Amino acid sequence: MKKRMLSFVLALALCLTLLPTALAAGNASFSGGSGTAEDPYQISTAEDMFALAEAVNQDKVSYEGSYFRLTKDIDLGNIHWTPIGNNASREGRQFLGSFDGGGYTISGLEVDVDSGYVGLFGVVGLSVRDSGAEVKNLRVEGKVSAARTSSF
């Protein structure tokens, strides 16, 4: 009985410890919207773009089935950019949502990485068949360079 109670308490403690992390992962802040096709997340600032990149790359939120819409031109200010989705071999580090640029432009993109995952988006729907992942109606201006090295 004591072992069963201890197991229960430890399991509860683990769940309570992980709960804030799980809640924070899905709470990236955007300029509006709920992420549905009818009410997509609104991306209108460089901060929104950085929040999306951080959620996918750090919090491992893929946004599968979620919708985004760019609402105006954005200048990323030539600040070093880490592509949205940066490692296809790790679950959750790829973008699986739908990003509609609305015909707007994201300028000032500057990417300089040591991998093959380069651009505004590094990995979009690579490992999930029929995920619906897409990036459309978007113009991107900036500089992208990649130095892929091998130890073979």
Residue ranges and their predicted role:
Residues 11-17, 21:
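Bacterial N-terminal signal peptides
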Residues 1-10:
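Positively charged n-region of N-terminal signal peptides that target proteins for export
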